[in-house]
């Protein structure tokens, strides 16, 4: 039996943060994929584990089936419980520990929410709303500008090393091309475009460093297979 069960979705970025951490820490897991079109994530069995009815939800079978949801909370749990060598995290007494937590909150409230809304209005909304697409694309650029400033004199967000703070940004940034692509609608009006490398070179270089990690490559290979199968 795998150490963890991860309730997931083949396309949603947030569960794949958890996969990244599990792979970085060499922890075994089984993924159960829900079909959002059928509303499977709202089934009674899943709501009993996660009353919010969203993914990811993680069950730790080696800790009395301890269950936790919210992707960045899961990252903290995995780091505190299983990253004893602090490969991708920091110890509680490290002066940068709360900076790490800070960036996880920034990812959740700054990147995740905005990228998600941009995706909704680009791919799923029932009608084109140019003002919404413009707003969220501009907000993406604002957040990338914040990261650009943070990374102007460092390679990673915290303590000059790769941590779950960096990891948390990877899956949503992986979708940047699609968020600025044509999507569901063709707009007659001009909407913001993005040249990531040219406009935000420090953030782009950071993202490329993250994508080069073996665990990240393996995660996106698994993601591609999951999309084919689900």
Swiss-Prot record:
Residue ranges of domain GST C-terminal in the record: 93-230
Keyword Nucleus (UniProt): no
Organism phylogeny: Eukaryota, Fungi, Dikarya, Ascomycota, Taphrinomycotina
Name of this chain's protein: Glutathione S-transferase 2
Domain of life: Eukaryota
The organism of origin for this protein: Schizosaccharomyces pombe (strain 972 / ATCC 24843)
Induction info: By O-dinitrobenzene.
Cited PANTHER family: GLUTATHIONE S-TRANSFERASE-RELATED, TRANSCRIPTIONAL REGULATOR URE2
One Pfam family per UniProt: GST_C
One GO term (biological process): cellular detoxification
Similarity remark: Belongs to the GST superfamily.
CDD domains (alphabetical): GST_C_Ure2p, GST_N_Ure2p_like
Residue ranges of domain GST N-terminal in the record: 2-86
Functional summary from the UniProt entry: Involved in the oxidative stress response and detoxification.
Record EC number: 2.5.1.18
GO molecular function: glutathione transferase activity
Keywords: Transferase
């Amino acid at each position: 039996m795998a150490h963890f069960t991860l309730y997931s979705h083949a396309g949603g970025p947030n569960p794949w943060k958890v996969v990244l951490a599990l792979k970085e820490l060499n922890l075994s897991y089984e993924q159960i994929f829900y079909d959002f079109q059928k509303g499977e994530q709202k089934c009674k069995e899943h709501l009993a584990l996660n009353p919010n009815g969203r993914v990811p939800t993680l069950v730790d079978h080696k800790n009395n089936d301890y269950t936790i949801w919210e992707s960045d909370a899961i990252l903290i749990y995995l780091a505190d419980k299983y990253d004893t060598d602090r490969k991708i995290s920091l110890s509680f007494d490290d002066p940068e520990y709360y900076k790490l937590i800070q960036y996880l909150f920034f990812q959740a409230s700054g990147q995740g929410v905005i990228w998600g809304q941009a995706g909704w209005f680009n791919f799923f909304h029932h009608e084109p709303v140019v003002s919404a697409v413009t707003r969220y694309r501009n907000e993406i650029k604002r957040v990338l500008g914040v990261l650009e400033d943070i990374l102007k004199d460092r390679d990673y967000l915290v303590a000059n090393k790769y941590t779950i703070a960096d990891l948390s940004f990877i899956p949503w940034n992986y979708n940047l091309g699609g968020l600025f692509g044509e999507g569901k609608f063709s707009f007659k009006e001009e909407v913001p475009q993005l040249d990531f490398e040219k406009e935000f070179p420090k953030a782009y270089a950071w993202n490329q460093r993250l994508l080069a990690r073996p665990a990240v490559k393996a995660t996106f290979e698994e993601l591609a297979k999951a999309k084919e199968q689900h």
